């Protein structure tokens, strides 16, 4: 099926190109999203008549996307999720999740603009792409953690393994301190016993 592109489409072509695509791809994606029209003589003629207007509109939306991209690109967003002690999520972080946290922070992002190359199924820092325009793409960082405190530690560069090791070391230190306190108290009791016995003998 032949269509004429109304904007640049990755791996297909530039605005105004007539390209061959699968009918399903055209009907389910290109046509309903206004990215292309069927390449009939009437549509091609209409495009040529509106080409200058379409190019101007595309340039305007590109500038808007670039302005947003300068603010959005490189931002880190916290996603709170339940996970096992080993850091495996009970579920996964989706493009909708990424769009939602960005929107909550004041950025207008739709889940259809987000691409996550590898499924996010573990705690930690993960990269997502945000395609703001056919020619404008930025990356954001998703800080997936079990709590805001954990997210803050991860943001400082500590991995889940390092955090777990620190927690284990802290727990072992507390146990060691507890045993030291118990041992010290026992020694004091043993030291007091002879003195008490001596006092008792003197009083007789």
UniProtKB/Swiss-Prot annotation:
One of its GO terms (cellular component) is ribonucleoprotein complex. The keyword Protein transport does not apply. Residues 180-204 are annotated as: Disordered. GO terms for biological process: translation. It holds the Pfam family Ribosomal_L9_N. It comes from the Bacteria. InterPro entries: Ribosomal_bL9 (IPR000244), Ribosomal_bL9/RNase_H1_N (IPR009027), Ribosomal_bL9_bac/chp (IPR020594), Ribosomal_bL9_C (IPR020069), Ribosomal_bL9_C_sf (IPR036791), Ribosomal_bL9_N (IPR020070), Ribosomal_bL9_N_sf (IPR036935). Keywords: Ribonucleoprotein, Ribosomal protein, RNA-binding, rRNA-binding. One of its GO terms (molecular function) is structural constituent of ribosome. Residues 187-204 have a biased composition (Acidic residues). Binds to the 23S rRNA. Belongs to the bacterial ribosomal protein bL9 family. This is Large ribosomal subunit protein bL9. It comes from Ruegeria sp. (strain TM1040) (Silicibacter sp.). The lineage of its organism: Bacteria, Pseudomonadati, Pseudomonadota, Alphaproteobacteria, Rhodobacterales. The gene is rplI.
